[in-house]
């Protein structure tokens, strides 16, 4: 990823399904975002130094190596030193997930998510963030 120019909009995307990750990256790119996309949290954390401050973090909930979307968002926020607006995309509807997301100020979107709905959610998070 070329970070030579600071983008107006920068997103971090984490999803361990490569096809979904690629689709999210292409979609965000068409919306004018520069994207740091990775299948695991460790890769994001390794590439994050030197990147612009993200406008938004998008993560799947169930990730590999024992990570969840909640812990991934926490790790990226800690690395950035600020509470970056975040959305977790999931099929899960459990009360534990909802409570953790609320406590960490993370928005939950249930799959399947339509692109226009995702864009509206991102725009509204950035507007208040």
Region locations from a protein language model:
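Acidic, metal-coordinating helix/loop segments flanking the phosphotransfer/catalytic sites
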Residues: 12, 25, 36-56, 64, ...
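His-Asp phosphorelay/catalytic-motif detector in bacterial-type signaling
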Residues: 52-55, 80-85
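Hydrophobic/aromatic residues positioned on beta-strands within the core alpha/beta folds
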Residues: 87-89
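Residue-level recognition of oxygen-bearing side chains
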Residues: 19, 43, 68
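Non-catalytic signal-transmission and effector/linker regions of two-component phosphorelay proteins
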Residues: 1-12, 18, 25, 74-83, ...
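Short, polar loop motifs at secondary-structure junctions
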Residues: 91-94
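Conserved phosphotransfer microenvironments
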Residues: 60-75
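Two-component/phosphorelay signaling modules centered on CheY-like receiver
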Residues: 18-36
């Amino acid at each position: 990823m070329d970070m030579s120019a600071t983008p107006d909009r920068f997103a971090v995307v984490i999803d361990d399904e490569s096809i979904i990750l690629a689709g999210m990256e292409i979609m965000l790119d068409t919306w004018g975002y520069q994207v740091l996309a990775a299948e695991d949290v460790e890769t994001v954390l390794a590439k994050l130094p030197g990147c612009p401050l993200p406008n938004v973090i998008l993560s799947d909930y169930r990730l590999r190596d024992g990570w969840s979307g909640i812990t991934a968002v926490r790790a990226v926020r800690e690395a950035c030193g600020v509470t970056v607006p975040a959305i977790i995309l999931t099929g899960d509807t459990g009360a534990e997930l909802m409570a953790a997301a609320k406590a960490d100020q993370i928005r939950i979107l249930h799959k399947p998510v339509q692109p226009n709905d995702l864009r509206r959610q991102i725009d509204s998070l950035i507007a208040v963030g």
